[in-house]
Curated annotation (Swiss-Prot):
GO terms for biological process: serine transport; threonine transport. Keywords: Amino-acid transport, Cell inner membrane, Cell membrane, Membrane, Symport, Transmembrane, Transmembrane helix, Transport. It catalyses: L-serine(in) + Na(+)(in) = L-serine(out) + Na(+)(out); L-threonine(in) + Na(+)(in) = L-threonine(out) + Na(+)(out). It is a multi-pass membrane protein. HAMAP family: Ser_Thr_transp_SstT (MF_01582). Pfam families: SDF. GO terms for cellular component: plasma membrane. This is Serine/threonine transporter SstT. The chain crosses the membrane at residues 17-37, 49-69, 83-103, 142-162, 180-200, 218-238, 301-321, 331-351, 357-377. Involved in the import of serine and threonine into the cell, with the concomitant import of sodium (symport system). The keyword Transmembrane applies.
Amino acid sequence: MTYPERPLLHLLTRTSLVGQIIVGLIAGLLLASFFPAAALKVGFIGKVFVSALKAVAPVLVFVLVMASIANHRQGQQTHIRPILLLYLVGTFSAAVVAVIASFAFPSSLVLASHPGEMSPPGGIAEVLQSLLLSVVDNPVNALISANFIGILAWAIGLGIAFRHASDTTRNLLSELSNGVSLIVKVVIRFAPLGIFGLVASTFAESGVEALKGYAHLLVVLLGCMLFVAFVVNPLIVFLKIRRNPYPLVLTCLRESGMTAFFTRSSAANIPVNLQLCERLGLHEDTYSVSIPLGATINMAGAAITITVLTLAAVHTLGIAVDVPTAILLSVVASICACGASGVAGGSLLLIPLACSLFGIPSEVAMQVVAVGFIIAILQDSAETALNSSTDVLFTAAACEAEERKASAA
């Protein structure tokens, strides 16, 4: 017995998520252009998508960070410390570049609403006071109220505590993390429909001005990533190896960044990076640890995304930011970026944590996340390419520096 073919279902299963998002974006634009009244009604789909993101984000941050810390292995004898330092310096430098670019070229977003009961911080002292109170919040209340700083604090604390637990307990945490990540992936699969509703309603209400705002935001994001890839990272590598870094930089971008751009997953690109390290003749005991570690914590692209989108929301809402607070944002964005690995849309879902520094409500922060999904077609690909290629770049730089030091001894 033969069953009739279902070309629509076949097309959906064969088309990538990026392709589906592009279709949803174009369909939303067309609907808003020709049937604005209908476009306003389908905005409900976008609201459902944003609500789903709001529901999953707190649990995601809590479980992911706790499981990651609990399952960290101790006692590995490798030259990992210099590479770890490069990862942290690179991520923080990327956040600083994003802060400078956001001040030099401020972006404005078209948000559905500007809540009137906002209480933006007056300066660094007030921010630190609010930060401390958020850290010591009740964990249940932190999850319910989406207090991401409190969630992060409890996740780190419990993760450290569970490092001394039995293997069974740590495996359970790892499986729990995988389960939550699967739920996130299911939510992200509905991104094309959510983007369709968001784009249709946004452009029906705001017209071409919203598109201009997104274009400017995308230019700032990609400009920061290109600057980090071709200026900041080569400078860091030069200080480490004391020779022309660009042959190595271009090799990593070509061999690792190209595949990462299309897979949009640092975890999926780990085999590619391991093979590239082998071809470069690097120390196997080092890169076998540093590459998976880099896929977890080396997140310069994510730091840029979190910083630029957060400051875009701050600029849109008219919140004044002083220099110390901007520096604190760079630190927070770097820490947030380390928790964005291996998760679909991870860097976008951590934006509310950074937004909370400025008293921005979760409702507004998740609208910013939705904007991020609209531009994610290019943003996420470029972010992953920067993150993954830098894993090999910094590993190669550290290995070469160690070899030079050993030969000089």
